[in-house]
């Protein structure tokens, strides 16, 4: 294959595609962000997920913010965000804008492949009409469309683009085979073919909806067990001795996928006349966990004898999950905002997050570990590997005598912390 590949969006999803395809084909990474393009041209991943060595191995890759370069591509892969707005309604603006840009610069006969997560039917109902209007072209005559939902998991060093089966679909059997053949050049386990684009779209939203619901169940169990006076972690470890018990843990559910994608499915369900109940119930539970954790932090501080107004809390971790720099839709922010409503001073430390981005996105100033004050409580919100070396002595130095540790991810041994005179509560 001597084709030219273009990838629109060089973020967490798009850049791995540019790098892997760029080892084989001429591959153009396109983004409207000049900052991202300049970083990539220097051989650096703006998100720090891909090493400089891997970036350098993509000898056929190039980067551009000029949409005219898209006219060179035989395949154009779209990997832009699909968020929800404040009312939790799908926000298609990034996808629509990308489709318009591509449609205006589409090579005759090109295949456009969408990787962005959408509800079943959105590619054909929303995206393809934008491609046609922008370029005055006719679908299935002048261009063709495929779909292959992204499965990138930020911070995961084991499950990567090249070793996870890729689901593919096309607007015709011929397009499907072209899309399958393209991805088979970089994905070692191969591809799974779907008979329709809608089926592939549905596949992605239920992958994340299933996980969201399982975590919601764990969160609800954690709330119940806390009221009963049972340690959730102990219960889950005991239940996990049965072969078919699913090993999920309670926690915050944020990020660009799990906390967002279910709303795409429920939106479509409402469109076709069905009001989903289980999915939305799970979303309500997970969306409320930041407030729940903040309330328990306050209760623990009161029990320890702290005055709440003017109390200090150190929060460890701001990213939406461990071992990555991604701050999108972080639910740690819910904890911070709720604590501030009580008059608590909150200080945040995250060695993975970008300080400028934290300030820009959330107005949160990140401090180094040494700059954290002695506080009434520590909320261990994100279990980065870099926090694994922290022991009871380290935590004690950042707490007043008898201070509280709120261990969201059960990362610390409560017996060790109790022995050091620390009060511990964990989800």
Regions found by a protein language model. Give the residues of each.
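Structural/interface elements that position substrates and couple domains in central-metabolism enzymes
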Residues: 1-427
């Amino acid at each position: 294959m001597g084709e030219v590949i273009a990838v629109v969006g060089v973020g967490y999803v798009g850049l791995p595609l540019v790098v892997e395809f760029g080892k084989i084909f001429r591959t153009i990474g396109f983004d409207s962000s000049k900052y991202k393009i300049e970083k990539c041209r220097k051989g650096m991943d703006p998100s720090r997920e891909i090493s400089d060595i891997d970036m350098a191995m993509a000898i056929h890759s190039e980067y551009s913010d000029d949409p005219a370069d898209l006219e060179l591509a035989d395949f154009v892969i779209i990997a832009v965000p699909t968020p929800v707005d404040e009312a939790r309604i799908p926000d298609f603006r990034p996808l629509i804008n990308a489709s318009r840009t591509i449609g205006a610069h589409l090579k005759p006969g090109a295949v456009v492949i969408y990787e962005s997560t959408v509800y079943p039917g959105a590619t054909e109902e929303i995206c393809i009409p934008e491609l046609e209007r922008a370029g005055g072209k006719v679908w299935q005559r002048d261009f063709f469309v495929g779909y292959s939902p992204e499965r990138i998991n930020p911070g995961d060093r084991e499950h990567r683009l090249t070793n996870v089966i890729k689901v593919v679909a096309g607007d015709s059997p011929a397009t499907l085979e072209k899309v399958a053949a393209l991805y088979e050049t970089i994905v070692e386990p191969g591809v799974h073919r779907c008979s329709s684009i809608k089926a592939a779209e549905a596949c992605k939203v239920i992958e994340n909806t299933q996980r969201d619901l399982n975590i919601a169940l764990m969160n609800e169990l954690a709330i119940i067990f806390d009221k009963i006076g049972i340690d959730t972690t102990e219960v889950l470890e005991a239940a996990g001795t049965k072969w078919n018990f699913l090993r999920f843990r309670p926690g915050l559910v944020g990020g660009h996928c799990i906390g967002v994608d279910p709303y795409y499915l429920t939106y479509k369900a409402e469109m076709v006349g069905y009001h989903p109940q289980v999915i939305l119930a799970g979303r309500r539970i997970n969306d409320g966990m930041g407030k729940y954790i903040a309330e328990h932090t306050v209760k623990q501080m009161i029990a320890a004898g702290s005055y709440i107004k003017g109390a200090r809390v150190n929060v460890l971790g701001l990213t939406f999950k461990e071992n990555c720099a991604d701050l999108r839709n972080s639910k740690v922010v819910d904890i911070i905002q709720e604590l501030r409503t009580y008059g608590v001073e909150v200080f945040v430390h995250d060695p993975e997050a970008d300080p400028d981005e934290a300030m820009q996105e959330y107005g949160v100033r990140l401090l180094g570990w040494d700059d954290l004050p002695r506080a009434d409580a520590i909320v261990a919100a994100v279990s980065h590997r870099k926090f694994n070396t922290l022991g009871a002595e380290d935590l004690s130095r950042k707490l007043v005598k008898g201070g509280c540790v709120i261990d969201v991810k059960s990362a610390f041994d409560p017996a060790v912390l109790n022995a050091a005179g620390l009060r511990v509560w964990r989800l």
